[in-house]
Each structure stands twice: as structure tokens, then as C-alpha cells.
Amino acid sequence: MTIFPMGNSKLSGPAILCSFLFLIRITLPLHSAAQSIASNQPATRPSFSTFRRTWRFRAVVLKALFLTATAAVAQVKLERAPGAQVITISPPGQTGDEEVIAVDRYNPKQVVMAYGGTVGGKAAYSTDAGRSWTLVNPAGKSQMGGNKSITFDDRGNVFLSYQLIEKLGTPGYWGHNARGNGIWVRHSPDGGKTWGADATPALVWPNGQPAPQQEDMARIWADNEPHSPHRGNLYLAWIDWQIDKSIVLFTRSTDHGKTWDKPWRISTHAGFPRDDTGAILGILGTVGPDGTQYVVWNDMLDTVMAVSHDGGKTFEPSRPIFQVGPPYFGGAASFPGIQRVMGLPEIAIDERTGTLYVTWSDCRNGDVDVFLSRSTDKGKHWSPPLRVNDDPMHNGADQFYQWLAVDPTNGDVYVEFYDRRADPDNLKTWVTLARSTDEGKTFTNYAWTVKPFVGHNTFLGDYSWLTAYEGRVYGAWAEAVSDTKAVVACGGCGTVGTPAIIRIGIADFNKSH
């Protein structure tokens, strides 16, 4: 069995990292999702202390390997996406990260986006399908935190969810001695132009006292399906970090965001308590044509799904649907230029057929690649992983931070990701847009950006974002600005690196090449 790419090329740090992670994967006694499903038995896994010791040992070895490694990547030039435009949305001198974007299906020229950063968060809206943008402050005089997500409902209202943290927990556990944290939702009645004076809390731990846990990575989505009995409902899920575990909490609103139900747990299995030790990560949900909800997340090596058939009142027990590589690629020492990278799962649905799609990134091939799996039977069975990026396999080039969208008007599948295939040193990063017109069976890769960026311990956030309607695609991502002075790139992490700005990409597949 060949573990490392063969030939004259030297291995990059990420390639060695991924190969070593694969060795850990086959030697560490982790649970098998496939076996668990087949046997209908509970999954087994090592103790937290065993898993943590293994990761610490791996980190030491990987750092030593990385310091002596370089990459040799074949130069590849992609065709530019049709009608491609790239706009810098963050104002000069301001940094940003964790950007989100959405289009109003009932008024497709109305597009809204938001992002976090040193200014606490901004939003922007467009009334002409992204040709021009107006920047606004959705928080007014109040605070707004990170880990944003955004959606339109069936009335054209915009809902922006986010977390607000006064103080992180101790280094050992996110949920230990955290203060003043919670999940909030802001509302705009006019497509992002104006925002309500106050945010609505979904779950809040008050200031001035240690909280028993910390809330993180909230994701909001809406039921806009014409034939759904739950049309108009809003749904929100997030990670609840506790001192000994991580779980998924869920809530819903049946009155267009005015109030939210008391959150409850939908993850049957609890993950470890931190993202770099095998915790639950990357929650996202979608709604089928009949109103069925599908929520996915990552739990160690498992992609897990929870399903609700009654508008979020109840959920079936969550279950692993397939296994992936480790979703956490560590810090800048193991992923050149980027402070940390996660291969979190995203889910989307073809509203015409009910076909489900899940994307993620992992390093099963020796470097980080983007993958997609599909289900045509409401999530019961899933196709083998399809590699979305089409550069030569095992070439040492990394593709990462993918996001998924399905055009509800025609079923075309789009995946956006950072791409290093054109740099022999595996440092310069472009943004690529992949498109499938055959229900996710094959993909064509297009260049979205022309000029690459190179970071130095840059914090890009934990995700990018993507949306599509009627052949017009909108993406949002962060890019390092290499010609500026170093700043604190992640306030909660206390590390220094190159700052990032926020970019919006537009592609129009209605235009001929």
C-alpha cells in the first residue's frame, strides 16, 4: 500500500501531515461508521485521554517533518468562470473573516452578505444582482460577534445569526469558565438595508458570572419550500461546548423570528470538548421539498445526520452516514500561511428532485482535496466520495475551505474552495468555483480569482460561503493582504499574522464563454 505520493517531487508540509494523519487513522482504534450502521450497534471510540495523547504526539512529529519539506506541484491554469467578477467589500484598513452571503429567491436581484472582524461585524446589500453594494452596520450601537450565518425567509426577510463571547473558556476546555456568551439573531425586513434595533436571543449565558458552557458555530436556515406544511419556519443549530463534551443544540421559530423555542439536544452521541481533539464541528441544515429537515455535522471521523419530519418538533436519533478524514488540519506550522483550516461538512438539496449533497475536505490522497457525496433516497444511502477538484491526484497541492450550493431553479451544483494547484510551493492561494450540471456526477473547475494571495499565519475564519439562483452564483471569502503590517489575526487566539480582507465573487453561467 502506497501512503505517500511517489516520484521525484518532495513532499509538502500538508502532504506529510495528511499522510501521517492517514497512518494515525488506520492505527488509532477509532469507530467505524459503516460497521455501526450495518450492525445497528453503538459506535466505540478511544478514551479522550488516549485520543489527545495521540494528537499531541502527531503534532510534534508533523512539525519536525514540515520544517524539512518542500512541494513540487504541476502548474495548472483554469478557464475563468463566465461573467466572473471579484469585489473587495471590506473598507480600506479594516479586516474581516467568516463571511456569509444569500440571495432572495423571490427577488433575485436582492443579495445580502455579512462578515466579522476587528470592527465587530458589517453587512452589505445589493439591489442589482451584485453589481453594486452598500455597506451597513446591522448591529447599530449594540455588539455583534462572530460565526455568522444568514438566510432569507419566504417573505423576503433577512435573518442573521451569530455568537457573542465576552470571554473564551480556559485553554484546556472551551466550555470551562467562559463568560457572557450566547447565540443571537438579527432581522432585516428589507433585504439587508435596515436592521432591527435589538437582536433576539436564542440562548444566552449572562455577563458577570462563569457560564457552565459556551455556544459556538450557529447556523440558521429557512423553510421556503412551496409545498411544505412548515413553510416559513426558521431553524437554528449550534455546538454547545461543555467541560467534558460537545453536543448539538437546536431551536426553531414558527413566527418569523419573533420568538424561538427553548433549545434542545439533537445529537445522540456526544463529541470531545475541543475542536482540535475530535469534537463535534460544522453544523448545517437544509429543507426538502416536503418540509423534511436534514442536519449534518462532523463527529471525529464521522459525518453525522439528524432528520426531522415534523418541522423540527422531533428528530430521529442522529446517525453516522459516512466516514471522512480528520476535519481539523491544525495550525500554521502544519498548513503553510494559514492559522488553521477545517474540512467541515456542508449539506444542500436539489429542491426539484430531493437529491441531497454533502461536501467536505480531507487528506485521504496525501494532500487536502474537496469531496462530494450524494443521496437519492432521503439520506439513507450515500454515493462513494467524488473528488471535486480536478488537478492531478497526489500532486501535493491543497484545496480547502469548500462551500456548497445548489441552484433551486435547475439543480446545478456549485462548490467553492481555496486552491493551490498553480503554485509549485503550495503557498499561493486562488479561489476556484466548480460546477456540476449532471447531479453531482462530474464537475468542471473554473478560476474565480486571477491574482493569488499569500498569508503568514492568517486567520481566514472557519468557512467561506456560497449561494446560487437562476445560473447566477455569489461567493464570499477572506483573503490575506500580504503588503500590510502584521496584526493580531485572531483575538481569541492571541496570535499574530497577516490580516485578511473580505471579497465577493460573482459568476453568471447564463453568459456564453
Segments and roles (model prediction):
Residues 12, 21, 49, 55-58:
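Intrinsically disordered, low-complexity proline-rich regions
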Residues 32-34, 74-76:
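Boundary at the C-terminal end of the N-terminal hydrophobic targeting segment
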Residues 75-513:
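Extracellular, repeat-based ectodomains that mediate carbohydrate processing or recognition
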Residues 11, 36, 42, 56:
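Cationic, low-complexity basic patches in intrinsically disordered or flexible, solvent-exposed regions
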